[in-house]
Amino acid sequence: SDFSSTILNNSFSSGNVTSYGVSLPRAGLLGDRLFCSLFELNNNDSRLITLARQVYLSHEAYYNATSAFVAFGEGNSHIGYIYEWVVTPNGDTWKVMVAGKGEYTSMNPVIYNKIVFSFLSLYNSTFARDMAVYLEQSLPDPSNGYSDGADYNIDISIRNVIPMVGSNTNGLILAASLYALHSSSL
């Protein structure tokens, strides 16, 4: 649509930042909004597909540099609703903000299940599978729906688990799954 084209034009004309060797637009990048757009819009603009790939690659590069899983999105956390920015509107990278506050917070980011499933549906990589296994070992049984996520900590006994089961998480997981099923049948 013209609206999504305008957003992409603005994003790609804003300059670039480099994070762990991956170039990203210097525009506000949140995983939920990006992947919802990719999975829900028909006839995706190639720039949207490229942007999703760059965001994925930046997560993998972050892991390769730090050995810590991240799957930046937005949602519940142990300190309230948060926004995990891959890139903030002013060009900072890998920043977490509590909703309603205009400053960054220092906390282990939540590895959001919905973002991990998005990575799996699009790329089915070893990195995405390993992150999914990490969450599977950390979270409650998904028989009533998938929990939001958990932070990264080698010691499972002190991981901050976000056990809430919500429509935003499960809706994006379903959209990612449907996208993967449809894409594999093409």
Predicted regions and their residues:
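Ser/Thr/Asn(+Pro)-rich, low-complexity disordered segments
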Residues: 1-186
